[in-house]
Amino acid sequence: MSTIKIKQVKSRIGAPADQKRTLDALGLRKLNRVVEHESTPSILGMVDKVKHLVAIVK
């Protein structure tokens, strides 16, 4: 499976608790941090849940 790089581009301040937990589960705790994950359905679902806070880096 391929990997994707995910970057947090917006602050988590003011976001609902479930979105904050999703960012934590992805390993994104600070702004402009990039993490790399396998492109599995569960990871893609988490990215979709916080798509307004993150960006996919090529």
From Swiss-Prot:
It holds the Pfam family Ribosomal_L30. SUPFAM superfamilies: Ribosomal protein L30p/L7e. It comes from the Bacteria. GO terms for biological process: translation. One of its GO terms (cellular component) is cytosolic large ribosomal subunit. Belongs to the universal ribosomal protein uL30 family. This is Large ribosomal subunit protein uL30. It comes from Bacteroides fragilis (strain ATCC 25285 / DSM 2151 / CCUG 4856 / JCM 11019 / LMG 10263 / NCTC 9343 / Onslow / VPI 2553 / EN-2). The lineage of its organism: Bacteria, Pseudomonadati, Bacteroidota, Bacteroidia, Bacteroidales. The gene is rpmD.
